[in-house]
Amino acid sequence: MNEEDTDFAWLHNNSAEHLRFLSHRIFIGPIPSNFIHSTSGFFNKRFQNYTKRQICYNVASPNEPPIDFSFLMHKSTDENPDTPSNLDSPSTQNVGSTNNTRASQSLLRRSSSFFRRRHRKNGTHASTDNNPFSESSTLQPQTAERTSQQAVRSAITETTNPSVSVQNSNSTSTSSAAMIIPHRDSQNSLEIAPLISPESQLSSLHPSSSRRHLISTPHVNRGTQFKRSSSCRNSRQPLLSGVDKHLTSNFTDANLIIKQSVVLARIESTFTVLPSDYNDSAAQRVPRKTISPWSQCLLVARQTDVENSIRLDFISKKLRKRLNGDVVHNLDVPHDKSYKSNYLFSVVLSPHQASWNIYNSFDNSMVLWCPYGKNKTLICLLNFQSSLLSFEWISIISRALLFSPRPSLLISVPAFHIHLRLNFPCFKDTTRPHTNETFVTTDDITQLSRTSTLSLSTASPRLVHDLVMKSWDISEDQFVESCLGVLEVNPEWSGIVKTWSKSHTLGLCWRMYDRLEWINSFSSLKYVGLLAAKDLYQLELRPKLHYPNHVTFRDGSKMDEPTPVEGYLIRLTSSTGRKTRYGRMFHKELYFAIFNNFLFAIQPDSVLPLSMLSKSLNLDDKLPFLSNNENDKYVYEFDPFKIANCRASGLNETIDSSVRESFLLLLQAERKRELDMLTIADSFLDLSRVESVCPVEDVEERNIFEITMTNGMKLVFQSYCERTRNLWINKITEVASYWKQRLFLDLQEYHDVRETNINILHIEQSIEPDVACYLNHWEVAGCVASTLIYHYCSMLGCRVIRMQGTLFKKKDALFEKCFAILIPGQLVFFQDATRTKFGKLCTKTHYRKRYSISLKNAFIYTGLSTMDEFARGPNDPQPHISRLPRCYEDGWQSFDRDDMLSFVIWSSGGVDYDLRPHHSVPDTAYGMAKDKLSKPKRFMFLARTRQERDVWAKRISKEINRGHS
């Protein structure tokens, strides 16, 4: 798996300053003993479970490599060589100690002054010297045996099916890597790789089938049998889709699986002859009948003897019931009852009958169509979980249908307003002998050009396809160096290019109007020549910019992003701003942590404090990852880059290997701890809506401060002492000032890009949405796109919060406004607006968590295919009718139609409403227990604008790609 596709790809960038900024955090105050001993019996069990397992797995990405704690074991044995260490039974004898007692709740809540005096007298906040958790911790590395047992019990661990080799009389299975396109050396030999059988993947679709089978084995255990309809058993041998003759070949020879994947399919039919460039925009002018909406099925590509073509088998149990009277064919499928009972239909990729195109360039969905029935055309829309998987299937289908990529392509450099033409040296273009074209000079391509120098007029389309794919087997750095080498030849650009390449990291991206999509992996780079031949995007060379971590105010002053803080506080007001409840003073002990402009509230017994994490790792003094501030004993600063060798450079070869390994292990553990806090957070406070933060002076205690919101609501908090109160006030004030300006600049960037493109095209604002969706890329080649909106942090996953903003979720026939936060592996929703039974909007202080949607094994699609999700009545406005613009509270106006704002998430995990009990163990509490037979759900959303919809869809798709990788 490519390291750039994992959740820790941000560790491999070259900017040491950016790495230090991402990993720097501050913990304020000691750990209050009564926060833990309020439920000492449960916390004992919970903390053992948490510290022994929580750092060893990722909640969102189970495919990430586990953390090696060998250096911790080595450290513990070196310090105490004579003392045996029992890692499986951590020391928790002080957890249930009765020395630190807590006053009765009835005594604490008699009155405001009495509550605070008793609170201080009984030691509500214990110092670190008297706190057993400050001196020792239960965080211990686990053994390999315990890790394997917990991996089986964990509900988050992803299980993979064992690979099953495909047997054939003319070919033998090999143990080589999986091949996308088979290479035929002779007529009787075909190299394939052992793949997972379709039955093993069908077990995930149909949980009732508990056994797996070999496809070509004649005598196997059949397992659960699916009943077939009598119409299919008694029907005669039908015509194969896409071929005008009966199927007479022997499927024993045609059982060679080239590729198989679980896809999302939509099946339609029409009587109209489709154009060769049929796509999402052309579908509006074609009358179609939907045979089956978007549903999950297994797509299998097999080699056949019919015209030496490839056959696509669609397999699904649920779709068979819908398509039984339409397109189900009783073909001589492989001899397996489970395969036959779920078999739908086949499409033979014949160049004379079948056609293909990229249906939606935004979500990389593709469309296949072929003759079907009498004067009918069968349309199959395919949506994939990842862009790389989509490119692989496009490569297979395009090669089978004799689609040959172009031997050259144009690359735009927006910084210099020039275009470069790159030509593949494995071809000799006889039609254009005198051209000033630029050649990519790499060792691989040069060797390929010496062995095969062909003419375009004599080469076959499939050979051209294979040679172009081989020509792109180069790294991104080699490709960028080739482009820069061309620019440096010109004396006019040589000095500028050298300065530009030193100050920025350059990369390749696709551009379509104002949208950018980075090519950030070697696997995606090999399909550039194939996608460029479709003329859907513009390939560009741009600098890779991260999300800005500084702002500039109107007076010219600059401010860096404040360091996020976390710690324990007591909230003395309810969500409605009241200080009393049922005649008693409101009192809630919580753990607060700042991420971006949010102050998240977490239950104290559900989180591992930052100070305990580093002390439990027991690192030596040479690596001061977390230490007390010299001027303030209540401040713990977590800074892994606090080493002199890491000030100038990042994690490169100049650093010692042991130090580099310790860095990576600690940063991964800290990222997983942050992700766990966001997963279990109950609510958050939006600090960008804070008006003022000031201490409360009219009380006897000096450790209380008040936050005033822009809507007039007030929140009261109590800290450990006066010093910690001042620290919280300063940090919250800095975060509020910074993120108010940062969010304003982000919105201004959206507005500037749209206004610039409107002025370039000389169009009205109401026409701009149609231009963005339906014009070709050469018609909008002069428009601009922003790398600050589509920054490189979204590709690497530098920040744990990938996206945030307002979405409108479809609930029955209405849309519910909610606030969404995208984190690795899931999309979390918080309640945005509450109303009374009379419809009056209620004011609130913070956002409560509602539910979350798992992005594991999910799909996302956009465009006109989402219009079927709308439940419209006869009086509802139709999407093609013009309407007044939508106006939002921040001043943004949107003329976009519903189909330009909508996107649908097809999730097999369903919704987690966070119904776990408060006192529960993390192994079994995270997520609602789901039935194995639960149906997948579709969730439809509307964004505020088309620009925000594009960003939401791209980043959600990237998270789905990481989970699929």
From Swiss-Prot:
Compartments, record wording: Cytoplasm; Nucleus; Prospore membrane
UniProt keyword annotations, A-Z: Cytoplasm, Meiosis, Membrane, Nucleus, Repeat
The keyword Cytoplasm is annotated on this UniProt entry: yes
InterPro entries referenced in this protein's UniProt entry, alphabetically: Mug56/Spo71, Mug56/Spo71_PH, PH_domain
Comp. bias regions, Polar residues: 82-101, 124-158
Biased composition (Low complexity): 102-114, 159-175
Chain segments carrying region Disordered: 70-175
Keyword Mitochondrion part of the UniProt annotation: no
Gene Ontology cellular component list: cytosol; nucleus; prospore membrane
Membrane topology summary: Peripheral membrane protein
Any GO molecular function: lipid binding
A single BP term in Gene Ontology: protein localization to prospore membrane
Pfam families, per the entry: PH_4, PH_SPO71
PANTHER family assigned to the protein according to its UniProt record, in alphabetical order: PROSPORE MEMBRANE ADAPTER PROTEIN SPO71 (PTHR28076:SF1), SPORULATION-SPECIFIC PROTEIN 71 (PTHR28076)
Similarity annotation: Belongs to the SPO71 family.
Protein purpose: May recruit a lipid transfer protein to the forespore membrane during sporulation, thereby aiding forespore membrane formation. Required for meiosis.
Protein name stated in the entry: Forespore membrane adapter protein MUG56
Gene behind the chain: mug56
